[in-house]
C-alpha cells in the first residue's frame, strides 16, 4: 500500500526529508515528497492505520455527506421482488420464499429467494443442511423462450462416506419441471472435487441424481487469481520494458487466460439453456465467487434486459451483492495486495473485464459504456458509497448500511452522471450474444489497467462526437 524512503541526508547522517509512495486501490501511484523525516513517518503511519480499518462503521461512506443529496436515494432496490414479478408473468411454477427471513437458514443468502412452488420451506431447510454454508439451490435466471432455468448453490456435503439428502434431490428434480435431464457445471477440476469430498464436500453422485450430468469446468480462484491480477498490474506499471518483454510478462500473468475460461464457461451454461434446452446448476465450493461469475455472465449473454444500465445494476444487486459475494474481504487491496491478505480475490473485477470484452465484440448490444464499467470497478475497491460495503446482506442489515450511507446506484442514475455512462450507439438486441474466446478476440482492458498512462483526450472527443451524431441526447430517457 505504501513505503517511505530518504531523499537526502544532513552532514550528521540524519535523514532530512523523505518520500511516501501510495499505491492506491484504483491503481494510481502517488508520491509525496515531505521535507521533514519525522513528518514523513507520521504520514506513513496515519495512512497505514486509515487504510486498514477493521470497524466497518468507521469507513468513509458513513461520513460522506454530499451537498443536496438525501440519505435513502437509491435505497432500497427491490431487485428480487421485481425479478419475481416479471417471472410470475411467465410461469407459476416458482415462488418467492421467505424461508430465510432474518437470515436464519443461510447467512449469506438474501431474506427472499426463488424456489420451485412444489418445494416446502421444510424441504428447503433440510436441503440447506446438505450444502456448504447452507447455500441450497435457488433460481438465478428463467429463460422465457424455452422455460429452462439457471440455478446456483454451493457444493453438496457428500463427504468420504457418500452422504445423501433426499430433500436436496427432490429440490433439484423439482427444478427440472418434468425435463428428463439437466447439467451441473462444477467450477473445479475433477481432482479438486474429489479432494473436497475427503474434507466433507464433493459433487453430486450420479446414482443419487440420475437426471443430472456433471461437467467440470475449472476456473482459477483465491490466491492464484489474485496473484494473476498482481502480475498484470505489475506489468502495466513497468513502462520501461520493451514491447516483446512487456507482452511476455502480460502472457505470463495469465489474466487474459482467466477471461477466456470465464467467458467459455458462461457460454457453455448459456448454450445448454438456449440451444440444448436443458436446465443448469452452477456451483464450486462456497458458491460465492466463481459460481456468481458464471451465472451473471450467462445472463448477460442470454438476456437483453441485463444489458441495459438499470438491468445491469439489478444483475449486480441480485447475483453479486444479494447473492453473498464477500466484497469486504475479496476487494480489500486490489492489484497491490500481497500474501498477507489471504482472502483477496478479484472475481468481481474479472466479471467486469469479461463484460468489457463483450462490449468490444458487440459494440451496440450494451446500453452502458466502458466508463460505467471502470466506475464500478473503482467503487468495488474504494468508494464513498455504501453499496459494496460488507460481505453479505445480513452484514449490511446489521451495520444499517441503507440508513447510514449513500447508494452508488442513486448517484449513477442521476442524469448529470448517467449521460456519461451510456453507449450512444446502443440498440436493443433480443438475441443471445455469443462471445468469441479466440486469442485475437481477448484483449487487455487498457481503459482500466492503463488509464493513468494512456491519454484519454482523443477518446473523450470521439465519444462526444458520437453522441452528437447519434442524437442520443434526444432519445427517450435522456432528456
Q: Where in the sequence are the language-model features?
A:
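Cys-dependent protein tyrosine phosphatase-like superfamily
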Residues: 1-280, 296-479
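Glycine-rich nucleophile elbow surrounding the catalytic serine of serine-hydrolase chemistry
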Residues: 285-299
Amino acid at each position: 500500500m505504501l513505503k517511505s524512503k530518504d531523499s537526502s541526508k544532513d552532514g550528521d547522517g540524519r535523514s532530512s526529508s523523505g518520500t511516501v509512495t501510495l499505491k492506491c486501490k484504483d491503481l494510481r501511484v502517488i508520491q509525496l515528497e515531505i521535507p521533514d523525516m519525522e513528518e514523513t513517518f507520521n504520514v506513513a503511519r496515519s495512512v497505514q492505520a486509515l487504510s486498514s480499518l477493521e470497524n466497518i462503521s468507521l469507513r468513509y461512506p458513513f461520513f460522506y455527506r454530499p451537498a443536496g443529496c438525501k440519505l435513502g436515494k437509491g435505497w432500497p432496490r427491490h431487485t428480487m421482488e421485481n425479478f419475481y414479478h416479471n417471472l410470475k408473468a411467465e410461469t407459476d411454477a416458482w415462488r418467492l420464499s421467505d424461508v430465510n427471513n432474518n437470515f436464519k437458514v443461510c447467512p449469506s443468502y438474501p431474506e427472499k429467494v426463488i424456489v420451485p412452488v412444489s418445494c416446502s420451506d421444510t424441504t428447503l431447510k433440510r436441503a440447506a443442511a446438505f450444502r456448504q454454508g447452507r447455500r441450497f439451490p435457488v433460481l438465478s435466471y428463467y429463460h422465457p423462450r424455452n422455460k429452462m432455468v439457471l440455478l446456483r448453490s454451493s457444493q453438496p456435503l457428500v463427504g468420504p462416506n457418500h452422504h445423501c439428502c433426499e430433500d436436496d434431490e427432490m429440490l433439484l428434480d423439482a427444478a427440472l419441471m418434468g425435463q428428463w435431464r439437466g447439467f451441473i457445471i462444477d467450477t473445479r477440476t475433477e481432482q479438486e472435487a474429489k479432494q473436497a469430498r475427503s474434507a466433507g464436500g464433493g459433487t453430486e453422485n450420479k446414482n443419487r441424481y440420475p437426471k443430472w450430468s456433471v461437467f467440470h469446468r475449472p476456473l482459477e480462484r483465491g490466491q492464484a487469481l489474485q496473484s494473476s491480477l498482481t502480475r498484470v498490474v505489475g506489468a502495466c506499471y513497468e513502462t520501461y520494458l520493451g514491447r516483446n518483454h512487456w507482452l511476455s510478462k502480460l502472457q505470463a500473468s495469465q489474466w487474459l487466460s482467466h477471461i477466456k475460461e470465464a467467458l467459455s464457461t458462461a457460454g457453455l451454461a448459456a448454450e445448454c439453456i438456449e440451444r440444448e434446452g436443458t436446465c443448469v446448476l452452477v456451483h464450486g465450493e462456497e458458491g460465492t465467487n466463481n459460481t456468481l461469475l458464471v451465472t451473471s455472465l450467462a445472463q448477460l449473454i442470454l438476456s437483453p434486459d441485463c444489458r441495459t444500465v438499470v438491468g445491469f445494476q439489478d444483475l449486480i444487486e441480485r447475483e453479486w451483492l444479494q447473492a453473498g459475494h464477500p466484497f469486504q474481504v475479496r476487494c480489500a487491496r486490489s492489484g497491490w495486495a500481497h500474501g498477507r491478505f489471504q482472502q483477496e480475490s478479484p472475481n468481481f473485477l474479472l466479471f467486469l473485464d469479461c463484460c468489457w470484452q463483450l462490449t468490444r465484440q458487440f459494440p451496440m448490444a450494451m446500453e452502458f459504456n466502458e466508463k460505467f464499467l471502470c466506475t464500478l470497478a473503482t467503487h468495488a475497491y474504494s468508494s464513498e458509497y455504501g453499496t459494496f460495503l460488507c460481505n453479505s446482506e445480513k452484514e449490511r442489515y446489521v451495520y444499517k448500511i441503507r440508513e447510514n450511507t449513500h447508494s452508488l446506484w442513486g448517484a449513477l442514475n442521476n442524469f448529470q452522471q448517467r449521460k456519461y455512462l451510456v453507449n450512444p450507439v446502443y440498440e436493443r438486441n433480443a438475441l443471445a450474444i455469443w462471445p468469441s474466446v479466440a486469442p485475437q478476440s481477448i484483449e487487455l482492458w487498457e481503459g482500466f489497467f492503463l488509464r493513468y498512462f494512456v491519454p484519454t483526450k482523443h477518446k473523450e472527443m470521439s465519444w462526444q462526437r458520437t453522441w452528437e451524431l447519434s442524437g442520443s441526447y434526444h432519445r427517450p430517457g435522456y432528456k
